[in-house]
Swiss-Prot record:
Residues 1-23 are annotated as: Disordered. Transmembrane segments: none annotated. Binds 23S rRNA and is also seen to make contacts with the A and possibly P site tRNAs. Keywords: Ribonucleoprotein, Ribosomal protein, RNA-binding, rRNA-binding, tRNA-binding. This is Large ribosomal subunit protein uL16.
Amino acid sequence: MLQPARRKYRKEQKGRNTGISHSRGTAVSFGEFGLKAIGRGRITARQIEAARRAMTRHIKRGGRIWIRIFPDKPISQKPAEVRMGNGKGNPEYYVAEIQPGKMLYEMDGVDEALAREAFRLAAAKLPLLTTFVVRQVGQ
């Protein structure tokens, strides 16, 4: 699973996931087809991997897949049945915070019908709304 190799600080505050993706990471840059987020939320490293596996299994050895997001925010949790207080819990997993317009995955080397179905299977593993996009001519 994806996670940062090192961090300056182990724990991070919750923060608020606001705004939209304006220019960076909003266009199909590497492949021919893309899966773009139209909802807002957090995607865990496990969900990113589950979606990648679903796509890879569907296209078999056909094309190439790019993952355009990385889970770099640690989420801490206290153990079960522990009383409140006594500090913040330990980092349990990592998430990528997603704003609307962010490109999640890209694919190349397959036809559109196969890519559309692979992205549909991947979208079922993700907790936010997505849409299928095709690279524009001249991009």
